[in-house]
Amino acid sequence: MQTDFISYADSQMEYEGYAAFDGAVTTRRPGVLVFHAWAGQDDFARVQAEKLAALGYVGFAVDMYGKGQRGNSAQENNALMQPFMNDRAMLLARAKCALNTLQHHPQVDRHRIGAIGFCFGGLCAMDVARAGLEGVRAAVSFHGLLGAPVGVPGGAKPLHTKILALHGWNDPMAKPADVVAWANELTAAGCDWTLEAFGHRGHAFTNPQAAEAANGMQFCELANRRAYAAMEDFLHETLQEKLSGAPSAKMGACPTPA
């Protein structure tokens, strides 16, 4: 496996992403953005990129905050994240910058892109999907925030990016009413969306460091394993098919209701 830190920039600042891929493969392959949680790009996000590389993708751990900008406490993490919660247009612009970087990677098929994210990163992946960006076929949210952006134009309807939300039903940051609102939003957009909800699970169930059950944040090995299996199947279905357009009937496709 080959791994590289990749510097990229926009008009605001410089960022440092992390790419992982099988260097022995010479053909272009799908790329998957990995959006980090509220602390910034860390070992957890980079490991996810490496796991994706082992599955045959180019994994790219995104840097949403800027090179070297990381949080070391809940207060610092929130200070880094909150500006993006207040300005979802800025969030999408940063995500687009990372997407452009991945799509220009020499190992990547720019027309077969996925996005996954954890917590805050789940929201980032969801906003990329909502925008209907060219080449982005799939988005997966792990215990992500679900609220729709305000004042940010969505993609053309029907939304072409398929979405999978892996959600702890007891997540205090995405309550049942939020889930219903999210489902209604995506249904109205004509999106092919899937929700897999894990009963008795809360926030951060994929993070081995999460151990605050009283606050609704607790790692769960079983839910983690099931969620990753669902992600693998979803990405294989959406990214490994080289032909563009609607999936064929033999793949079990169903028409999206008008």
Q: Could you describe each region identified by the protein language model?
A:
Residues 1-258:
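N-terminal cap/leader regions of alpha/beta-hydrolase-fold enzymes
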